[in-house]
Every structure is written in C-alpha cells, then in structure tokens.
Amino acid sequence: MGRRMIDWKRSARHGKLLAREFRIEENNNIVLAIDSGRLMCEPVDGVPKVDRAVTAALLSAFIALKGGDLVSLFSFDARPRVASGAVRGSPSFTMIQKRAAEVDYSTEETNFTLALTTLAARLDRRSLVIVFTDFVDPISAELMLRTVGRLTERHLVLFMLMRDVELETLADVAPAEPEDVARSVTAGDLLRQRQVVIGRLRLLGAHVIEADHQRLGPALVERYIQLKEENLL
C-alpha cells in the first residue's frame, strides 16, 4: 500500500494500516476528438493512424460509459466532421460505435483552429477533451498550440500521440552509406522538433501521452482511470 493510500487517522485509531476510501466521481464529460486529416491517414505498421485512434477511442468510450461518465465523439480534418451528442450508460456504446464508423480518411490538412474552436463552443461544462492527432514540427503546429492554450483555460486536455518508430529507427541506425547519414540527421531533427511541440503542449497545461500504436488504447484507459482517481476531471 502506497503512502498516499493510507488513512493515517483511522490507522492510528484502529492500531493497523487502513486504506483511504476514495469516492470516484461519475457524470464527467468525456470528449473523444479524432483528427482524420492527412497526417493521421499515414500508416503505422500497415494500418492508418486514424484507424488505430478510433480503436483506442472506442476502448476508452466503453470504459467511460461503464464507469458512469458521459461520452461524445468528434472528428475533424480541414473542417469538423462527425459530431455525436453526449451519451451515458453501457447500452449507448453501440451509438458511439456507429458514429465512429463514419470517421473517414482525408487528404486535407487539419485545421486545428476551426475544429477546436467549434468543439469548445459546443461544450457547456468542464470536460476531458482527448485529442488523437499528429504533427510534424513547431511551425505546422503553431495554430494548434494557440487554440490549445484557450481550450486548457476551461477544460482538461489530453493529447494521444503514436510514437513514430520509423523515424526513431532512421535516427538510430548506424549509417552505411552517405545518404544514410542525411536520412539519420533529418529524422533526428524531426524527432527533436516533435518533442519541442510536446513540451509546449505541456507548458500550456495539456497532458500528453506518446505510446506505441499497440499500447495507445491501454495507455489512454490507464491515464483516464488515474485522472478519475485523482479527481482531476
């Protein structure tokens, strides 16, 4: 039992270690916001990132609905696309599944300003906004960062990112040819720029999870449960 879990007053009274009793709040508002723009349609291990994001979103929706929270789905590329209403209760999972099936591939650049501003205008209470997205560098992500700063003033924002294993491999591989050196340097630069954006997101108050694609759903569920237990929602 960790120290944070110990109820010291009750333990002293009863002469043994007793755990604190936590009341996990229900009725939180959870928004699953899926970027379906061009970058998210690139494959990771043979499957488009947006498909992996939808799978992770559905897993978290199932857990959140079962836990008594409200869940809604929102997707966007150059403009807002899918927008479900908020639902509650396990039987509503079918509706979330149906709306998730409408999330489609796009060759358009993502317009974060329009998408996140539209989403924020629809939220009439503090929410956990989970954004599944990707970005390349600080310049392309600049408009996203400006909008996120406004969103975090009222809401808890969590970014879900998939690790770019291909870039990491290119950056780490021992070069055998001159062109390998150029590829390695470029990959390393892109990874560093990505970390700059992640760092700025955190400075703005957003939470960020960068996970392997097969761990995206489980990592999200773990963080969601942690946030609930810490009464941060």
Regions found by a protein language model. Give the residues of each.
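An amphipathic, basic-hydrophobic helix/alpha-beta surface used to engage anionic
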Residues: 1-91, 126-133, 139, 146-150, ...
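Short, basic, glycine/proline-bearing loop/turn elements
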Residues: 5, 100-104, 130-133, 182-183
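Hydrophobic alpha-helical scaffolding
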Residues: 50, 86, 105-109, 137, ...
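Short acidic (Asp/Glu) and glycine-rich catalytic loops that position anionic groups and cofactors
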Residues: 74-79, 92-99, 125-128, 175-180, ...
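A glycine-rich phosphate-binding loop feature that marks nucleotide/adenosyl-phosphate handling sites
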Residues: 76-79, 117, 217
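Short, electropositive alpha-helical surface patch
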Residues: 84-98, 216-219
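Von Willebrand factor
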Residues: 92-128
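Von Willebrand factor type A / integrin I
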Residues: 121, 125, 139, 143-233
